[in-house]
Each structure stands twice: as structure tokens, then as C-alpha cells.
């Protein structure tokens, strides 16, 4: 383990926790995240732009140049080029560092910030980056009563947030041993998600589960054309591919769709904080099942997803959907009350011939009857299911349910499905269970190599699955180890006989003593 890296990460996490602790009670956790993450993003793009400009000027011999000290008028000459190259423009006077200096004495700080955020978004209008910046600061409500009942109190709170974010050691680490901004984001999301319970789980897939899904989806590959998430939340799962493969190995970038506007904004912020250029991500704010985006895109070689469990959708109330090429091959739609398999069919439709999809699924879809059974039959009969993995319970924020992973492929070399029982692959950490690196490695290697291990994994021919009435539950195929104590009947009978003999001897001695007493 890299001790320096862990030490830096711990320092960063302690500092973030201190900000949250300082503001506790004024803005409740899950609402507060928008402010901290939003200001962290504002600081990041300010420093990113400044460093980019300074680096160019210093390389040209202008070693004393510092963009933050430039006048707005002088900087204006570079606006067009910067928008083309970086996707946005910030005047020197509106950079995070300069706003921070003036903030304690700015009686109209809320209005100043509102104007700055509007200017940043407007700088991208008409440019290729417009969609990536539009509405990005909408969730940072600088006039919210949650910050305080008066303008003075709200501004005091804003100064605290700005100083807290400004004090974070995000750019001073040598050798970039940690992805500081990105790591801070992930820590904050995890912290708030765990405290927010069920609502937090909608935004954030735990890092270990993200790691597992991603490694399954890219196993055997050193690069992919792009990565896609059907319900991308805050983007943490999408970005795991950048960590696992390296962001340059995701050649065309990161794609996703998210129905919740707040989460959609968080996802775009997350992309920027992980240093993903505006032209390397495409996140859409639409209903994936009813209004899918990326129709015309080249199919995806890696799909990872943790869609919402058993949500309602239009289903057969919408006559158009049964003819939708994503769903029509199965001949039936997922039930209106349970959209899980609609997300699976959507992912399969978007998947490249040489691609892999890894999707977290609610366990009920593996065995329920009706339309869901017909969709399972379609998937099995067409050999699209590569593996089903039973996960431990209590891995996710807000639910203790033991979920599964369904792995899809379109070009399998054999007509069989691998079943893995990973329900015992975890350690307990506070209120949740957690996958260790060893657990993840065991699952990924078993899945990729398709190895059979007693009580853990089994390769099942698809016709055997058909004989089981298309039940996909792991427990149907992977035998449970009998952990009950083995009893030796012969030995037990001998012990009983010995006890009876001792009892008879004692009775005889007691009778003898009683006779002597009565004597």
C-alpha cells in the first residue's frame, strides 16, 4: 500500500469532514452536498483554467505571468480561444481565489456569486460545450433560507463554505499521488449517501461495487471505445473505467442518462472534477426507458449500471413501446410495476457485439413469473447471459437487500451461463458490508476465466436452465456448503451407554448409603 497516498487521502478526508461538521445543523447533509460540491467545482475550474493559461505563458517565456492578477479587460482577448479549448471562460475578477479574498467584506456576496455562476454558464453558450455547462450551478441556491433567515446570515454561511473549500489541500500534493478533487468528491458523496440512507443510494454506488462492475465489464481489454451507464446517478460508476483502464483508454469518452436534474448536475460536475474534458463526456437528462438518448451512437463496448430497483414505468400503457426495437425482440414488456428488465433490455440493445454489460439487479427478476419469465427465456435462449453473480446483502446505502449482477454478452463461445455465489465475500464495516480487494479479485477472475469451484461457482448449460423453467437464481445451481456439525451415531450411542452405566452405578451407591442410614 502506498503510505504517502493513504496519508494524503486521510488528511483530505479529515478536512472535508471538518467543513461538514462546522456546518452541521444549518444545512442538513443531503441538501448541503450541493453547496460543498458546487463550490468545489467552482474552485476546480478556476484553478484548472488559471493553471492552463499560466503554463502556456510560462512556456512562452513570460515566467512572471499569473492569470489571477490580470485585469478583466486584458483577459477578454483570450475568451474565444479559451472557450474553444477548455469549453468555458472565467474573468480574473470572478475566479474563486479573487472572490474568496473579497467575500468577507462583500455585503452582496449572494448576488455576486449568482452573477459569477451565470457568467460561467453563459460563456459556453453557442459553443460545443454549451450542453455540458447549461444549468450546472442551478442547485447552488445562494438565496435559500436553508443557509439562514436573513441575507447577512446567508452570506456568513457562504463565506464559511467558501473558506472551507478554499482551505482544502487539493492542489499542493507532489507527483499527483492522489486524484485530489475527484477523491474529495467521492468521499463527500459516500459520506452524504451513507447518512441520507435510501435517498443517498439513488445517487451513489459504493466504490467497491463500482470497481467490481467495471472490472467485469472491461475484463480482457486494455481499451474500449466508450463506457455507458443507463441510469448514471452522480457518475461515480461511469468514472471507474477511467481509474481501471486509464481515461485515455476510453477512447471516445463517457456516456450516460439520468432522469433526476439534481443528480444530472452532480454527474456533470463529477466529470469535470475528474479532469474529463467537456468533449469526452455526454450525459443526458432524460427518461432512459421512454426517451432514450444516444440512439445514433456507435454501440458501447462497456456498459455498467445500477438502475433503480423495481420502479414503475409506462410499460404496456404506452402502445409505442412494444414496437420499440429495444424491447420488441422479447415479445413482451417488463411489468408496469417493475421496470428492472426494461433496463436490462435497453442495455443489451446499446451493447456492442464485442462488448460486456454488468448490471446490478433486484433478485426478484431472477425467478418471478409472467412477463419477466418470458424476457428471461428470450435472454437465455439467445445466449445473451454470460453470468449471474449473487452479491452479499447490505452492500448498498439505503437497502439491505442482497442484489445480483447480470453480465450480458452478444458473442459468447459456448451455450452456458456461469453462476457465482459471492454472498459470503465481504467484511463487515460499521452498518454495511463491504467487498475487499481480495473478494473483488476472486469474483472477477472466476467470471473471466469461467472456472468452477465447489460451493462458489458453476457453469450451467442453457438447456439445463430451460429445464428449471428459466429460473436464474444462483441458489438453484450453486450448491450450498453444509456447515452443520457432522454427528457420528455410533460414537454418540457409545457415549450414551457410558453415561447410563455411570448413572446406574451412582444409583446403586446412593441406595446403599440410604439403607445404611435407615439401618
Which residues does each predicted region cover?
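Non-catalytic, mostly N-terminal accessory regions of nucleic-acid modification and defense proteins
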Residues: 1-212, 216-217, 221, 279-291, ...
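A conserved structural/catalytic subdomain of Rossmann-like adenosyl-cofactor enzymes
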Residues: 2-3, 7, 297-519
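Residues within well-formed alpha-helices
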Residues: 19, 183, 240, 255, ...
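Short glycine- and Lys/Arg-enriched binding-loop motifs that mark or flank ligand-binding interfaces
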Residues: 34, 197, 229-231, 252, ...
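A structure-centric signal for secondary-structure junctions around beta-strands
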Residues: 36, 181, 224, 251, ...
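Short small-residue beta-strand/loop micro-motif enriched in glycine and branched aliphatics
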Residues: 193-196, 250-251, 427-428
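Conserved S-adenosyl-L-methionine
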Residues: 199-305, 310-312, 316-321, 326-331, ...
Amino acid at each position: 500500500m502506498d503510505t504517502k497516498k493513504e496519508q494524503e487521502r486521510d488528511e483530505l478526508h479529515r478536512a472535508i469532514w471538518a467543513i461538514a461538521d462546522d456546518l452541521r445543523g444549518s444545512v442538513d447533509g443531503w441538501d448541503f452536498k450541493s453547496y460543498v460540491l458546487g463550490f468545489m467545482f467552482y474552485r476546480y475550474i478556476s484553478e484548472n483554467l488559471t493553471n492552463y493559461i499560466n503554463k502556456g505563458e510560462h512556456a512562452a517565456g513570460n515566467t512572471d505571468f499569473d492569470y489571477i492578477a490580470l485585469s478583466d479587460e486584458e483577459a477578454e482577448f483570450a475568451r474565444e480561444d479559451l472557450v474553444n479549448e477548455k469549453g468555458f471562460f472565467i474573468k480574473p475578477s470572478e475566479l474563486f481565489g479573487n472572490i474568496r479574498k473579497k467575500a468577507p467584506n462583500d455585503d452582496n456576496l449572494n448576488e455576486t456569486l449568482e452573477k459569477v455562476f451565470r457568467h460561467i454558464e453563459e460563456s459556453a453558450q453557442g459553443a460545443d460545450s454549451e450542453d455540458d455547462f447549461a444549468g450546472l450551478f442551478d442547485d447552488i441556491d445562494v438565496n435559500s433560507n436553508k443557509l439562514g433567515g436573513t441575507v447577512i446570515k446567508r452570506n456568513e454561511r457562504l463565506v464559511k463554505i467558501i473558506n472551507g473549500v478554499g482551505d482544502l489541500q487539493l492542489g499542493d500534493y507532489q507527483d499527483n499521488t492522489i486524484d485530489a478533487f475527484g477523491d474529495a468528491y467521492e468521499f463527500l458523496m459516500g459520506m452524504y449517501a451513507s447518512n441520507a440512507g435510501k435517498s443517498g443510494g439513488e445517487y451513489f454506488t459504493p466504490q467497491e461495487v463500482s470497481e467490481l462492475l467495471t472490472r467485469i465489464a472491461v475484463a480482457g481489454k486494455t481499451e474500449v471505445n466508450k463506457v455507458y451507464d443507463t441510469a448514471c446517478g452522480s457518475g461515480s460508476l461511469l468514472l471507474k473505467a477511467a481509474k481501471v483502464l486509464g481515461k485515455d483508454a476510453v477512447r471516445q469518452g463517457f456516456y450516460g442518462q439520468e432522469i433526476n436534474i439534481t443528480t444530472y448536475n452532480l454527474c456533470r460536475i463529477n466529470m469535470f472534477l475528474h479532469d474529463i474534458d467537456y468533449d469526452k463526456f455526454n450525459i443526458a437528462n432524460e427518461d432512459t426507458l421512454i426517451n432514450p438518448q444516444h440512439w445514433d451512437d456507435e454501440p458501447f463496448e462497456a456498459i455498467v449500471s445500477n438502475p433503480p430497483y423495481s420502479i414503475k414505468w409506462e410499460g404496456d400503457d404506452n402502445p409505442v413501446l412494444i414496437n420499440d426495437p429495444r424491447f420488441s425482440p422479447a415479445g413482451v414488456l417488463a411489468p408496469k410495476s417493475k421496470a428492472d428488465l426494461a433496463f436490462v433490455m435497453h442495455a443489451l440493445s446499446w451493447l456492442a457485439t464485442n462488448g460486456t454489460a454488468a448490471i446490478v439487479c433486484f433478485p426478484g427478476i431472477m425467478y418471478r413469473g409472467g412477463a419477466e419469465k418470458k424476457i428471461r427465456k428470450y435472454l437465455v435462449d439467445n445466449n445473451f447471459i454470460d453470468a449471474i453473480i449473487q452479491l452479499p446483502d447490505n452492500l448498498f446505502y439505503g437497502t439491505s437487500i442482497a442484489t445480483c449482477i447480470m453480465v450480458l454478452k452478444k458473442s459468447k463461445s459456448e451455450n452456458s451461463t456461469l453462476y457465482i455465489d459471492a454472498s459470503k465475500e465481504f467484511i463487515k464495516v460499521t452498518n454495511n458490508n463491504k467487498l475487499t480487494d481480495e473478494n473483488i479479485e476472486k469474483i472477477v477472475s472466476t467470471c473471466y476465466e469461467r472456472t468452477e469451484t465447489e460451493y462458489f461457482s458453476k457453469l450451467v448449460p442453457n438447456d439445463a436452465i430451460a429445464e428449471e423453467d428459466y429460473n436464474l437464481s444462483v441458489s438453484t445451481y450453486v450448491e450450498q456448503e453444509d456447515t452443520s456439525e457432522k454427528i457420528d451415531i455410533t460414537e454418540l450411542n457409545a457415549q450414551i451407554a457410558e453415561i447410563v452405566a455411570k448413572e446406574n452405578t451412582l444409583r446403586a451407591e446412593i441406595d446403599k448409603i440410604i439403607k445404611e442410614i435407615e439401618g
